[in-house]
């Protein structure tokens, strides 16, 4: 089973999965947690993590994926957070910086990726990369 928590991708990743016939047998949920408040309330991201590292960080991505996996006891979970632009965030992290966290039966990995392009392109590239991460988990474990 698969669960997804999206910030910068804003539902695009879930939409890409739902485009595929038969996904209903695997996809449990996809939620968009764009604000810090929703990351805390829906996913259990710690306020201290957001204050110390910011919403766009490896630590936040890790807590997001842990939270979404725990909600419905998913086998596979993915979380995305990043800066789609057009401006960098208040801490100066660059446009295109993306963290994609994956969870598989308790194992968590976080990939830091930088994409070039406009807001639309960065969001699409991040979604495609997250799909690729799901694909790699499935191939490795089947």
Descriptions of predicted regions:
Residues 1-142:
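Short alpha-helical segments enriched in small residues
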